[in-house]
Amino acid sequence: MEVLANYIGGTWTKSKEENTVAVINPASQEVIGAVPLGSHTATDVASAVAAAAGAFAAWREVPVMKRVQPLYKLKQLLETHAEEIARTITLECGKTLAESRGEIQRAIENVEVACGMPVLMQSEFSENIAPGIDEFMIRQPLGVCACIAPFNFPGMIPFWFLPYAIACGNTFIIKPSEKVPLTMLKVFELIDQLDLPEGVINLVHGGKETVDALLEHPDVKAISFVGSTQIARYIYAKGAANGKRVQAQGGAKNPVVVLPDADLDMSVKIITDSVFGCAGQRCLAASNIITVGDQGVIKEALYESAKSRTTGFGLDESVEMGPVITPDSRSRIEHLIDKGIQEGGRLLLDGRKPAISGFEQGNFIRPTILEGLPLDGEVIRTEIFGPVMSLIELGTVDEALTFINSGRYGNMACLFTSSGANARKFRSQAMAGNIGINIGVAAPMAQFPFSGWNESFFGDLHGQGRHAVEFFTQTKVVVERWPKEWSRKF
């Protein structure tokens, strides 16, 4: 199996690391690639940083109108090759083709927003702020920036950062997850066609050694990360200790509240899509479904909807849910289901160890539903990152808000209702960075920041939109005095 190459300084280069790890199709366990993994990947990082640092001085001087021109072409190339990239995502990540296509569309939307950088970078000016004095603020790029990407959205999440960073005048390095490196390889085949100076955008493969090399290199000025809370905390602490600007998106345990006045059919469809879409492997997946009052009807409807969901290989257009990423992930999810039963929960729908014809070795779990779990138990409070729904019954909206705000995470909270008063109360009081009203996946569009609170985010500025512009630039305030007359000249 050929080892995937890095892309450094505008050239495809072989890694200095001889040890490799296989890239596995999670539906079949077929080996579909290999990436370098080991201490010598730090040498690859050094080469990528040198290339990016070498390109920065000239790239930052390119007018912003010129810097965004390659992004227009990148958008067109992504649109042209969207189906090919989507199929690659499905092969290595496991999600359905429909989900993979949607992922690429979100990537394209971020490129479109970044194309507006000539306006987004406009700053502030105050004329005659004091007699004869003008004051203004300018934005300048940071230098070499890097993205450490997760496995679950290999085609989208790097685009929360990449187009904004280079449009602001920075140079960039992407380190994809070693589990799903093929998607970025496809993207970089398109980047290679852009009219960009060598070293502006670079790709390096690897694992923890690669990450640590990026966190420790003095010429890397900013780090963007998305992944688990445990790793996000590590990235933030180590990056900040080395003087870097860091944004680190962590995990989640997302609650959805359903009031008695909610539209039944709409709520059921949207909630089941949120819980089981992408096999539950997304940081905005609903997990704890809270019904206010006795709502046996919606519980039955959720059960029937989940039970009918088709599970299988994502390239089959009829499939509605694919596998989870690794056997270890499946084992962890199954352990948490077992734990829920041990905690006194009732298993309404058991998705463990399904038989998927033709894909018996795949990492499959069918939709699973638990109810009656203790509110302070491990399963209710732990991010499962799999297709598991926990049903909770509470008496009032206030009780639901108290429960939501007692959690350690704060990525998303959603409410289903036809009451404007309850919607306004919920969006004001729920302690989460992304709020959905009659929405099951409150994913911000590219113009808005992907906001996480509490242990779902470490940092100050998020990805996407204006937050990305602020993250990838530093401000400089200039105060100028221009007297009408000079009393003396040297």
Model-derived features with residue positions:
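Residue-level signal for inorganic ion chemistry
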Residues: G10, Q29, R67, I89, ...
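Residues at or immediately preceding the N-termini of alpha-helices
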Residues: P26, A42-V45, V64, A82, ...
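Hydrophobic face of amphipathic alpha-helices that form TPR/SEL1-like repeat modules
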Residues: M1-A34, R352
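Short, well-ordered beta-strand elements within core beta-sheets of diverse protein domains
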Residues: G33-G38, G54-E61, C147, V256-L259, ...
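Conserved C-terminal structural/oligomerization subdomain of aldehyde/semialdehyde dehydrogenase
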Residues: S28-V35, L196, V220, V257, ...
